[in-house]
């Protein structure tokens, strides 16, 4: 079995995020929204609702399960991959594309961004280093990305 993204090949099984380029604080992404909406959005966006310069990269492997593996290298050196903090379980691109629009005018969670348990992270040594990401499934399929950083969080960057 494979996860099949809508309108995208089954060869696309994960998405990577450069945390240095993500600040989903309501004051930044919806400055004109009502204060109650901003407060709720910041709580909802949790770990994405502030700026960071920690050189962390997050990898959302949608179909991750037993037998999968994630390897990341920076300049030929392996980086330690760990499970992301639960405050970073919501996919930041989904928050950016869908939830900002919703929370600008409402406090209801229409088309809510679900919390996921398949978000992983590594810490790079530099904000401009290129990472090689390799994700393998238990069936021998290998999915790769050369992640050039900085990698902005916007629709065009992630359009396939």
What are these model-derived regions, one by one?
Residues 1-160:
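Metal-dependent phosphoesterase/phosphodiesterase active-site architecture
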């Amino acid at each position: 079995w494979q996860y099949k993204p809508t309108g995208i090949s089954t060869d696309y099984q994960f998405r990577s995020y450069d945390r240095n380029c993500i600040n989903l604080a309501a004051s930044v992404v919806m400055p004109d929204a009502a204060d109650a909406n901003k407060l709720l959005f910041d709580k909802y966006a949790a770990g994405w609702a502030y700026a960071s310069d920690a050189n962390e990269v997050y990898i959302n492997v949608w179909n991750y399960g037993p037998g999968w593996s994630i390897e990341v290298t920076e300049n030929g050196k392996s980086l330690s991959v760990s499970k992301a903090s639960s405050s970073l379980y919501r996919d930041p691109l989904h928050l950016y594309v869908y939830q900002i629009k919703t929370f600008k005018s409402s406090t209801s969670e229409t088309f809510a961004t679900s919390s996921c348990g398949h978000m992983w992270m590594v810490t790079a040594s530099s904000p401009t280093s290129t990472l090689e990401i390799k994700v393998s499934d238990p069936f021998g399929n290998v999915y790769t990305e050369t992640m050039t950083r900085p990698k902005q969080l916007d629709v065009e960057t992630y359009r396939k």
